[in-house]
């Protein structure tokens, strides 16, 4: 009984202690570190923004594109000089209307045409010493599509009406040449020469040599042979001169004349014999030996 009264009395007594308050937050060095990181983040954001603005200004970024590069409905448009450090893949490259398109390189410019397996089919290489083209066939045509020049493994075709060679030494053909007409420019000489070998001209229907406004000369060191197997050899001219034919001896007692007759030996050799009242060829047969 006394314990119950004591307990009831204790419970009814007013508590002298106040309510407990729990403080929530970051204090001390943690708070200073947080402020430092927030300040550092703001500085980085400002630096990043300044760098972005600087890059946009330097690279000349606009709504249409970047610098000399413009994005249009038809593709990309470059104004001014452009430099590509890596391979460029494009369907079509063209310049502005009225302007030329230039390709510049410190070493060479190579254009490759590839198939589906990335194998090179044709190649064009322009270097400091030569321009090389690789392919099965090479053709040069006019604007209208007429063939001017073509070359492949079997033949080289020149489709122009005239082929002119302006070199001082002319043209050298190590093999045979087949053409319907060989002629020089007007008022120019045409010279066919084989310095160390023979020169042969053949045609199934004949070979015609014509000099319309000048002379024609055939000069050789040893023998000049004119042969017709089934036909004739005609010398058709108002004057025919053989100034260097050998002359037979004449008799001192005979009358010396300035008229000679042409004699033919059995071996076909020609010589001159002083004309007399009769034929004097038999007298000068020593020339035929």
From Swiss-Prot:
UniProt similarity note: Belongs to the sarcoglycan beta/delta/gamma/zeta family.
Species per Swiss-Prot/TrEMBL record: Mus musculus
Principal location class: membrane
Glycosylation sites: 60, 108, 284
Domain of life: Eukaryota
Subcellular location: Cell membrane, Sarcolemma; Cytoplasm, Cytoskeleton
Assigned GO CC terms: cytoskeleton; dystroglycan complex; plasma membrane; sarcoglycan complex; sarcolemma; sarcoplasmic reticulum
Residues on Cytoplasmic side: 1-37
Extracellular-side positions: 57-289
InterPro entries: Sarcoglycan (IPR006875), Sarcoglycan_gamma/delta/zeta (IPR039972)
GO biological process: calcium ion homeostasis; calcium-mediated signaling; cardiac muscle cell contraction; cardiac muscle cell development; cardiac muscle contraction; coronary vasculature morphogenesis; heart process; membrane organization
Stated name of the protein: Delta-sarcoglycan
Tissue specificity annotation: Most strongly expressed in skeletal and heart muscle. Also detected in proliferating myoblasts.
Keywords noted in UniProt: Cell membrane, Cytoplasm, Cytoskeleton, Disulfide bond, Glycoprotein, Membrane, Signal-anchor, Transmembrane, Transmembrane helix
Pfam families reported in the protein's UniProt record: Sarcoglycan_1
Subunit structure: Interacts with FLNC. Cross-link to form 2 major subcomplexes: one consisting of SGCB, SGCD and SGCG and the other consisting of SGCB and SGCD. The association between SGCB and SGCG is particularly strong while SGCA is loosely associated with the other sarcoglycans. Interacts with DAG1.
